[in-house]
Amino acid sequence: MATLEAIKYDGEKLLVLDQIKLPLETHYDEVLSIQDGWDAIREMRVRGAPAIAIVAALTIAVVMKRSTFATAAELAAFVRTSLEHLRTSRPTAVNLFEMAGRLEALLQEQPADCTEAALRQAVLSYIEGMMQADIADNQAIGKFGAEAILKDLSADVKVKVLTHCNTGSLATARYGTALGVIRSLHEQQRLEHAFCTETRPYNQGARLTAYELVTEGIPGTLVADSMVSLLMKQKGISAVVVGADRVVANGDTANKIGTYQIAIAAKHHGVPFFVAAPLTSVDLKLSHGSEITIEERPGKELTHIFGQQLAAPGIGTWNPAFDVTPADLITGIITERGVAYKAEGQQEFDMASFAASVGRA
């Protein structure tokens, strides 16, 4: 069965699947302006660090194609202003900032006599190449992740894997990161069962990951976030694999709220805990997880579901969207260039050395 598409782009039109309405309704919103793209990201109609970056970039592309600029300088100013605004949509996912930095570097590299047409083509080529690159990267992550989980097992053993939040086709251009690893295991007929958490308070696991598993015929079971420790104790979980919104130089990883407690439970039960993310999610400018800006979401997302209030009126809320899992709880970090592991006896990763060793640009 074909994988789901969170982003549809045909070179002229950009459609974004409204993931807030899933799984009850499948509806695509057309992005016509920079503000439309910002709203889709901020309101979490599109989410997942890779998808956020792609939608932001394609937003610039479609608006640029419908606009005219007298000079290359005028076009460059439009791109820079658009990036400045789009950066403010979600602060934790590093892919958006990585994309913006690379696009700004591309603008800076153009010769002084660059024409508007030449600059337009350079910007569009970079942006439109992002989707295909993301799909290829995700498939490589799936391959390397499956190998890492299976490497010490005999060929006839099937695995049970737990994941958190949504990291599949709905969070990327296609295929997925952590869910891509599960897909790869399933394609190899080495997956016995996938378990996904509901992922409160936004229920990305219940609404989105469960939807992807059912749609694609992958054997799966939904569990409440509070069931994870008992699940590991009683159901024989082989590995945990989660995504990442930002991995810093020592391997500390920001991911959807609830990831940290799953990592603690995995450590206690001796379950390998893997992070799956493209190298664009690795932020070598930050040394430790304490430096990551953690987005806080409106309290209504915690007290209401589909507009219906569940919590007692007047109760206070604290609603961080992410937490940081320390490197010492992480078994390996799966990327499109291979799996990063800690040196023997070390509690932290050396992501700079790993990135250099695999030729990260």
UniProtKB/Swiss-Prot annotation:
The active site is at residue 245. It comes from the Eukaryota. SUPFAM superfamilies: NagB/RpiA/CoA transferase-like (SSF100950). It comes from Monosiga brevicollis. Pathway: Amino-acid biosynthesis; L-methionine biosynthesis via salvage pathway; L-methionine from S-methyl-5-thio-alpha-D-ribose 1-phosphate: step 1/6. Belongs to the eIF-2B alpha/beta/delta subunits family. MtnA subfamily. Catalyzes the interconversion of methylthioribose-1-phosphate (MTR-1-P) into methylthioribulose-1-phosphate (MTRu-1-P). The record marks 165 as: Transition state stabilizer. GO terms for molecular function: S-methyl-5-thioribose-1-phosphate isomerase activity. This is Methylthioribose-1-phosphate isomerase. Its EC number is 5.3.1.23. HAMAP family: Salvage_MtnA (MF_01678).
